[in-house]
Curated annotation (Swiss-Prot):
Belongs to the TRAFAC class myosin-kinesin ATPase superfamily. Myosin family. Residues 914-1237, 1314-1443 form a coiled coil. Detected in melanocytes. The gene is Myo5a. This is Unconventional myosin-Va. The modification Phosphoserine is found at residues 600, 1450, 1650.
Length: 1853
């Protein structure tokens, strides 16, 4: 189409920019033909006038739509040009953190300078088996493509990794080799893949160095061939090296280092084994200090040295050789420190006893004088004579450096040879994959011979690359049958001819090297004369006559001629080499052997490979004087030959290209420098690939994809039934130029830009449709708005009018109401006035009447009171007369009472003082409060008595005073009468005065007594109040303490309960982890056994020697040769003679190291399995103990010994009782039976006596077992370990006998040494275990002795207590118990104070001992119950026998006829649930029931688990017969046969499910009928009678449990193999909801798949397969809990594989795909609901996938969205969330991408989340399986044996 159609307004273009290389801009107006200027708007907001080139008129490059940016394949872009490629790489690298991108057949890898979690084994598993175009670009995808093409096309492959130094070539090659090592595995036990990977650290240490561009730059090229056998497993490898940079050994530029190995040696100089090397710091050596940068940040040279030595050991380089290598390297360092002193201009000398040279000679084992001489002289040979010439100081220094380089190069080649020998395999190589790690195009300021060779190699590789790309394009066009047009591409053959043709640059250089006086200047002149102005690719610099310029495919490079000849000749003095060859150090002459030995045909072809597998690379030029032709080859000639061989190898293989890009020169992580990137893209051929693709038809669509995408551009009438014709018709209308597209068989091919044009048409059509939709919707919205407003206006009018009417009605109501209110109000006012007046009148009347009534009352009252007064006065006068009479009596009483009061007062004073003392002594004592209170009460009583006395005294005093007053008055009145008695008056006055004085004294005493009483009362009250307050405080404190104690107890209880719950959960988690580890070990053990069998089979096939009796057949059962034992315990029970393989071992030398490793590994696994089992038992016991701890704690300390003693006595009494019953039964039998029947010779008598005798013996045995209970506890532990050691020694002895039969003496010696070390190790282990067991036994003996003493003491105390009366007995027992507990607590406190750990261990041991004793006693109980059952059975048989004989024998027959056995027919109900078979029929039973049984017929026609029931019934019969050999043989054959069936038909789900179900049922039967109480409680009484009576098969239960675990793991593997091809297609690729997922909006160049589509799977396919699995398991009668576990594992596999592929496929991360995934998950959940499996935990395994689907669907813009995502995606790791957001790709241009800032926000919010950094889920993870006990209700006696099983030789019993 015309440019005017493309360059329209708003079109975006790319314009050149000096800083950013390319800058984006937008057109501000349409372009018209003839315009000289384009008006552009830049992204930074500026406007620009862009002038077009007036000569060419070329328009700027158009920019791809945003929807196309970030594509996985650069060739999928619509516009293919440099800015589009650069921008796409930048967006993927910076925004999406994606370092890999496809460019056609090339994988572009950008070095992130950061460790990324994308190379783990989970990533390898995700890419394994996938098509290259289905997954995101990755080095693993390229490796997988190469591996699949090798297997499919039977053609060797090559992976060519190139790029600048620091671009990541070595790392990419390393990851490719790791992928091959992981997915293929090795064909032997020697772990070849580990050796291949181990070669990397060795080669990096001797071939890598730090440069200014890279800290780990490879300074050599290498091509590694990884060999595979016919089964495509790694068998070996071979390495070729190219152009080692030898000059780095003697010179390093600023900020660079020498090879890593030198610094590693210096860092490890302090190791004892390196003392002899006399090394020091790297700065002390001339060859390591020139760069001034001896350290690399983040690298520990000492650790790297340890890794290097470890790798050397793994590759078989012995310790002596390693020390030899280090010795030579140290010698090179010391040689660099050798200094020269000038004598004159032409000669020099070395100082005498020069220390560096002395150390060098000592290390190299050469003569000091000789080496010193030839370092300063050289030998010249002419045609007639030879003479020695001294050399100058400069020449001597150059010779020294040349010698150092030569030694290092020889050592490098020697190490490469030994690495190749270690990687060599004796198995014939079928195919190989080569990995080429070679330097990319280089150009520096000064370019020399090394850059010339590197760029020459890149010219050859680029030519091969161009031819391959051209070939692939041609094949694609021919495949689609479209017209082939010649594509013009750059051909660099002229440049190659300039370099390597006759009279080319290399040819002239070799010719100049042959000239005696050839120089760099003369060589330059020859170049100018030959090629200047004759070859367009050769130029001469203007300002130099010692340089030349070559126009390479990438850029022009100017080479300096100085040094070309010297480097090409690589001259080393012959005399110096001779001195080294004469070294006493044996390893040094090996380095200088003739090159013929290094490339001998035998060494190249001995392994059956082509001679190209070992090619000598860049050997140095031979010394002067040698005549061999190959030693005269120059470095350039050798490099050209090796390069030709390399190109021949690459041309014979299918190449795969990896181009590594260095994003910046500063090693900043995820920093993209556009200038440097463009330079490398041009140099590595990526842009050439783009140009070739753009010249053809880069965009390719299938017809269905095109129709789905551009259906909007078609009219209804254009759509036909034939989609292909529809697409043709539409394209002819849309694109008029038919040259812009071509129709292939399955695809439409578009030229560059056509898809973008179609996208523009589609966008325009959609935009026009959007405008029309918007117009219609806007009109509809406005009309809808108008109608709404109209309805609103009418509604408002209606409501307003209604409101007005309501207001008027309200006015009328109010008017009427006001009139009514006024009427009633007026009436109310008048009525209230009337009521007030009436009330006032009533009040006045009431007050007046009251006044009159009160006056009348007063008058009556006065009269009444007058009468009373008169009565009172008269009474007073009478009393006064009486009082006067009593006066004298009262006075006497007063005197007496006063005297008594004084006495009482003194007494009270004394008591008061005693109270004060008591208070001082006992104040504050709470315990005396009650006594004080009582005394206070007594004092109060006394006080009251005193107060009453005082009151009486006052009364007497007052009465006396009154009497005296009356007397005085009377005397005064009768003074005259008293004159006669004057003397009497005086005496009376004196007496009055005396009485007054006494009265005053009494008053004062009364006052003091009252004061003291008040004071005492106050003090007493204060004391009481204080005591009450203190008592209150004490009570409060007591309540507080009680409350605190209760709270603390509650908190402690809660804490203990919470801790117990947490510990229980942790123990359960630990139990699951241990169970998982144990089951993984079982899986590893099975894998090793299978590998062992495979090795034996391969050895047999390799020998091609027929072996009688061991030839494998196609039947379901094979010979014993392919059997593998299950475990060490199981192996002990097998009665199989050891097999020898003398015919094989005598004819073939076996790999003894392989057998020793295998035997050692098997032994280790068996020991680890036993340890894991013990640990598992311990964990389960710990969980049990934690649950029962609270219940059993009160009983642990006190009742152990009593319980044991009483239980033993009870058992002994029970045994005695049983024995008595047996004797009574025997006596009764002898009395009741007829004499003839019970005669000693009668058969019945003999049968009965034998049975009774056996029962009696059994009882005696049980009694002895009870008596030796304690000894058993001690001996059980001692009997286990020696048994294991004995088995180990037996296995070692058998292996030694096998080894001694081999012929190879070297291997026998090696095996003997290994066995000696093994025996020494076992002996030391045995001695240590013996000592520990002896110590433990001694401790147990001491404990037993102490327990015996304690038991005796307890018995004595018990006997004493029994003699006491009941009350005293109880008191004595309590006292004894208190004493015992006190002593025990004191002992424990002392023990805890002295050693808490010992105290804790003592408690644990005590508890364990009690548990063990209880278990032993429980076992004895069970034994007694079994004996009772046997007695009952015998009694029943005896009764039946008596009755049967009495009924069937007549009296005459008793006398005359001999007794013969009578067969009594039994009814069906009398069957005992056992099956009888002969021992010789055991193999037939196993064959018919296991080996040749078809699960389908059994599952459909018979009861589930029938084989398990039959086998158990046979075991029951063998147990009934007490035949341990028969039980062992049957169980062993059963287990081995099941293994054989699963090994033969292990890929059949139905078979594996069938035998998993039957194995579990067999295991449940062994538990159900074991006789253990925990299993018997679910049985019926009849089933309990069927329990095993003679054997405890607990060990076989463990063996069967392990077998069931292995079968379960195999079932999971079968499930995974069946489901894996369906999951990605059904869950991700298939459109379950049609029309939701849009087609990719570009002509996505779907990379050609190496595997054709094998059919499309849908979600229905997965559901049908799940239904099939479920129905098969149900038909086989699998336990429901086990089915739930299988379903959970299936759903985990579905979720993990789906999520992993989602995280590795950018095209699947879209909104529509999230909806599809969510719908698919809902269908799976619906399936779970239909099957009633929602509680199986399967739904939870899909939670990560559900959250990933939700993450694709939610908004991803604001901070709130980020918060919602962080809270929602709790089942996804941070790496997974960020990966999904980075991969999120809109399906169309109307959807926005996730911004980088939003992703950063998510990362910031999730930075504190502690989760795994792993990106992918472990799809290989298997949940630990458990087999919950599921008893069967099926009665064994009712089971019928179908005739179809062919088991007629067994009989029901």
């Amino acid at each position: 189409m015309a440019a005017s159609e493309l360059y329209t307004k708003f079109a975006r273009v790319w314009i050149p920019d000096p800083e950013e290389v390319w800058k984006s801009a937008e057109l501000l107006k349409d372009y018209k033909p003839g315009d000289k200027v384009l008006l552009l708007h830049l992204e930074e907001g500026k406007d620009l006038e862009y002038r077009l080139d007036p000569k060419t008129g070329e328009l700027p490059h158009l920019r791809n739509p945003d929807i196309l940016v970030g594509e996985n394949d650069l060739t999928a872009l619509s516009y293919l040009h440099e800015p589009a490629v650069l921008h796409n790489l930048r967006v993927r690298f910076i925004d999406s953190k994606l370092i890999y991108t496809y460019c056609g057949i090339v994988l572009v890898a950008i070095n992130p300078y950061e460790q990324l979690p994308i190379y783990g084994e989970d990533i390898i598993n995700a890419y394994s088996g996938q098509n290259m175009g289905d997954m995101d670009p990755h080095i693993f995808a390229v490796a997988e493509e190469a591996y699949k093409q090798m297997a499919r096309d039977e053609r060797n492959q090559s992976i060519i990794v190139s790029g600048e130094s620091g671009a990541g070539k070595t790392v990419s090659a390393k990851y490719a080799m790791r992928y091959f090592a992981t997915v293929s595995g090795s064909a032997s036990e020697a772990n070849v893949e580990e050796k291949v990977l181990a070669s990397n650290p060795i080669m990096e240490s001797i071939g890598n160095a730090k440069t200014t561009r890279n800290d780990n730059s490879s300074r050599f090229g290498k091509y590694i061939e990884i060999g595979f056998d016919k089964r495509y497993r790694i068998i070996g490898a071979n390495m070729r090296t190219y152009l080692l940079e030898k000059s780095r050994v003697v010179f390093q530029a600023e900020e660079e280092r020498n090879y890593h190995i030198f610094y590693q040696l210096c860092a490890s100089a302090k190791l004892p084994e390196f003392k002899m090397l006399r090394l020091g710091n790297a700065d002390s050596f001339h060859y390591t200090k020139q760069g001034g940068s001896p350290m690399i940040e983040g690298v520990d040279d000492a650790k790297e040295m340890a890794h290097t030595r470890q790798a050397c050991t793994l590759l078989g380089i012995s310790e002596s050789y390693q020390m030899g290598i280090f010795r030579i390297l140290a010698g090179i360092l010391h040689l660099g420190n050798v200094g020269f002193a000038s004598r004159d201009s032409d000669s020099c000398t070395i100082p005498p006893k020069h220390e560096p040279l002395t150390i060098f000679c000592d290390l190299m084992g050469v003569d000091y004088e000789e080496m010193c001489h030839w370092l300063c002289h050289r030998k010249l040979a002419t045609a007639t004579e030879t003479y020695i010439k001294p050399i100058s100081k400069l020449q001597a220094t150059n010779a020294r450096d040349a010698l150092a380089k030569h030694i290092y190069a020889k050592l490098f080649n020697w190490i490469v040879d030994h690495v190749n020998q270690a990687l060599h395999s004796a198995v014939k190589q079928h195919s190989f994959i080569g990995v080429l790690d070679i330097y990319g195009f280089e150009t520096f300021e000064i370019n020399s011979f090394e850059q010339f060779c590197i760029n020459y190699a890149n010219e050859k590789l680029q030519q091969q690359f161009n031819m391959h790309v051209f070939k692939l394009e041609q094949e694609e066009y021919m495949k689609e049958q479209i017209p082939w047009t010649l594509i013009d591409f750059y051909d660099n053959q002229p440049c190659i001819n300039l370099i390597e043709s006759k009279l080319g640059i290399l040819d002239l250089l070799d010719e100049e090297c042959k000239m005696p006086k050839g120089t760099d200047d003369t060589w330059a002149q020859k170049l100018y004369n030959t090629h200047l102005n004759k070859c367009a690719l050769f130029e001469k610099p203007r300002m130099s006559n010692k340089a030349f310029i070559i126009k390479h495919f990438a850029d022009k490079v100017e080479y300096q001629c100085e040094g070309f000849l010297e480097k090409n000749k690589d001259t080393v003095f012959e005399e110096q080499i001779k001195v080294l060859k004469s070294s006493k150090f044996k390893m040094l002459p090996e380095l200088f052997q003739d090159d013929e030995k290094a490339i001998s045909p035998t060494s190249a072809t001995s392994s059956g490979r082509t001679p190209l597998t070992r090619v000598p690379v860049k050997p140095t030029k031979g010394r002067p004087g040698q005549t061999a032709k190959e030693h005269k080859k120059t470095v350039g000639h050798q490099f050209r030959n090796s390069l030709h061989l390399l190109m021949e190898t690459l041309n014979a293989t299918t190449p795969h290209y990896v181009r590594c890009i260095k994003p910046n020169d500063f090693k900043f992580p995820f920093t993209f420098d556009e200038k440097r990137a463009v330079q490398q893209l041009r140099a590595c051929g990526v842009l050439e690939t783009i140009r070739i693709s753009a010249a053809g038809f880069p965009s390719r669509w299938t017809y269905q994809e095109f129709f789905s995408r551009y259906r909007v551009l078609m009219k209804q009438k254009d759509v036909l039934g034939d989609r292909k014709q529809t697409c043709k018709n539409v394209l002819e209308k849309l694109i008029l130029d038919k040259d812009k597209y071509q129709f292939g068989k399955t695809k439409i091919f578009f030229r560059a830009g056509q898809v973008a044009y179609l996208e523009k048409l589609r966008a325009d059509k959609l935009r026009a449709a959007c405008i029309r939709i918007q117009k219609t919707i806007r009109g509809w919205l406005l009309r809808k708005r108008y109608l709404c407003m109209q309805r609103a206006a009418i509604t408002v009018q209606r409501y307003v009018r209604g409101y007005q009417a309501r207001c008027y009605a309200k006015f009328l109501r109010r008017t009427k109401a006001a009139t009514t209110i006024q009427k009633y109000w007026r009436m109310y006012v008048v009525r209230r006035r009337y009521k007030i007046r009436r009330a006032a009148t009533i009040v006045i009347q009431s007050y007046l009447r009251g006044y009159l009534t009160r006056n009348r009352y007063r008058k009556i009252l006065r009269e009444y009171k007058a009468v009373i007064i008169q009565k009172r006065v008269r009474g007073w006068l009478a009393r006064t007369h009486y009082k006067r009479t009593m006066k004298a009596i009262v006075y006497l009483q007063c005197c007496f009472r006063r005297m008594m009061a004084k006495r009482e007062l003194k007494k009270l004073k004394i008591e008061a003082r005693s109270v004060e003392r008591y208070k001082k002594l006992h104040i504050g004592m709470e315990n005396k409060i009650m006594q004080l209170q009582r005394k206070v009460d007594e004092q109060n009583k006394d006080y009251k008595c005193l107060m009453e006395k005082l009151t009486n005294l006052e009364g007497v005093y007052n009465s006396e005073t009154e009497k005296l007053r009356n007397d005085v008055e009377r005397l005064q009145l009768s003074e005259e009468e008293a004159k006669v008695a004057t003397g009497r008056v005086l005496s009376l006055q004196e007496e009055i005065a005396k009485l007054r004085k006494d009265l005053e004294q009494t008053r004062s005493e009364k006052k003091s007594i009252e004061e003291r009483a008040d004071k005492y009362k106050q003090e007493t009250d204060q004391l009481v109040s204080n005591l009450k307050e203190e008592n209150t405080l004490l009570k409060q404190e007591k309540e507080t303490l009680n409350h605190r104690i209760v709270e603390q107890a509650k908190e402690m209880t809660e804490t203990m309960e919470r801790k117990l719950v947490e510990e229980t959960k942790q123990l359960e988690l630990d139990l699951n982890d241990e169970r998982l580890r144990y089951q993984n070990l079982l899986n590893e053990f099975s894998r090793l056994e299978e590998r062992y069998d495979d090795l034996k089979e391969e050895m047999t096939l390799m020998l091609n020697v027929p072996k009688p009796g061991h030839k494998r057949t196609d039947s379901t059962h094979s010979s014993n040769e392919s059997e593998y034992t299950f475990s060490s315990e199981f192996a002990e029970t097998e009665d199989i003679a050891p097999r020898t393989e003398e015919p094989i071992e005598k004819k073939v030398p076996l790999d003894m190291s392989l057998f020793l490793k295998l035997q050692k590994r098997v032994t280790e696994l068996e020991q680890e399995k036993q340890l894991m089992q013990d640990e598992l038992d311990r964990k389960e016991e710990q969980v049990f103990r934690s649950k029962a701890k609270e219940e059993e704690r009160p009983q642990i300390r006190g009742a152990e010994l009593e319980y044991e003693s009483l239980k033993r006595q009870e058992l002994e009494s029970e045994n005695k009782k049983l024995k008595n019953e047996l004797n009574e039964l025997r006596k009764a039998l002898s009395e009741k039976s007829a004499p003839e029947v019970t005669a000693p010779g009668a058969p019945a008598y003999r049968v009965l006596m034998e049975q009774l005798t056996s029962v009696s013996e059994e009882l005696d045995v049980r009694k002895e077992e009870v008596l030796i209970l304690r000894s058993q506890l001690v001996s059980q532990k001692e009997a286990i370990q020696p048994k294991d050691d004995k088995n180990t020694m037996t296995d070692s002895t058998i292996l030694l006998e096998d080894v001694q039969k081999m012929k190879d003496k070297g291997e026998i010696a090696q095996a003997y040494i290994g066995l000696k070390e093994t025996n020494r190790l076992l002996e030391s282990q045995l001695q240590s275990q013996k000592r520990s067991h002896e110590n433990e036994a001694e401790a147990l003996r001491g404990e037993i002795q102490s327990l015996k003493e304690e038991n005796n003491r307890q018995q004595q105390l018990l006997a004493q207590n029994l003699q006491l009366p009941p009350e005293a007995r109880i008191e004595a027992s309590l006292q004894h118990e208190i004493t015992r507990l006190t002593n025990e607590n004191l002992y424990f406190e002392e023990l805890y104070a002295d050693d808490p750990k010992k105290y804790q261990s003592y408690r644990i041991s005590l508890y364990k001992r009690m548990i063990d004793l209880m278990e032993q006693l429980e076992k004895q109980d069970k034994t007694v119950r079994k004996l009772k059952k046997q007695l009952k059975v015998f009694a029943k048989k005896i009764g039946e026998l008596e009755v049967g004989q009495m009924e069937n024998i007549s009296p005459g027959q008793i006398i005359d006829e001999p007794i013969r056995p009578v067969n009594i027919p039994r009814k069906e109900k009398d069957f005992q649930g056992m099956l009888e078979y002969k021992r010789e029929d055991e193999q037939k039973l196993v064959k018919n029931l296991i080996l040749e049984l078809k699960p389908r017929g059994v599952a459909v026609n018979l009861i589930p688990g029938l084989p398990a029931y039959i086998l158990f019934m046979c075991v029951r019969h063998a147990d009934y017969l007490n035949d341990d050999q028969k039980v062992r043989s049957l169980l062993t054959s059963t287990i081995n046969s099941i293994k054989k069936v699963l090994k033969k038909r292990g890929d059949d789900f139905e078979t594996v499910s069938f035998w998993l179900s039957n194995t579990c049922r067999f295991l449940h039967c062994l538990k159900q009928y074991s006789g253990e109480e925990g299993f018997m409680k679910h049985n019926t009484s009849r089933q309990n009678e069927h329990c095993l009576t003679n054997f405890d098969l607990a060990e076989y239960r463990q063996v069967l449990s392990d077998l069931a675990i292995q079968i379960y793991q195999q079932l999971v593997r079968v499930l995974e193999n069946i489901l894996q091809p369906m999951i990605v297609s059904g869950m991700l690729e298939h459109e379950t909801i049609q029309g939701v997922s849009g087609v990719k909006p570009t002509g996505l160049r779907k990379r050609t798949s190496s595997i054709a589509d094998e059919g499309t799977y849908t979600l229905d396919s997965i559901l049908r397969q799940l239904n099939s699995f479920h129905s098969v398991m149900c038909q086989h009668g699998m336990d429901p809990e086990l089915i739930k576990q299988v379903v959970k594992q299936m759903f985990y596999i579905v979720g993990a594989i789906t999520l992993n592929n989602l995280l590795l496929r950018k095209d699947m991360c879209s909104w529509s795909k999230g909806m599809q995934i969510r719908y698919n998950v809902s269908q799976l959940e619906e399936w779970l609901r239909d099957k009633n499996l929602m509680n199986s935990g399967a739904k939870e395994t899909l939670e990560p996938l559900i959250q990933a689907a939700q993450l694709l669907q939610v908004k991803k813009k604001t901070d709130d969205d980020a918060e919602a995502i962080c809270s929602m995606c709790n089942a996804l790791t941070t790496a997974q969330i960020v990966k999904v957001l980075n991969l999120y790709t809109p399906v169309n241009e109307f959807e926005e991408r996730v911004s980088v800032s939003f992703i950063r926000t998510i990362q910031m919010r999730l930075r504190d989340r502690k989760d795994s950094p792993q990106l992918l889920m472990d799809a290989k993870h298997i949940f630990p399986v458990t087999f919950p006990f599921n008893p069967s209700s099926l009665a064994l006696e009712t089971i019928q044996i179908p005739a179809s099983l062919g088991l007629g030789f067994i009989a029901r019993v």
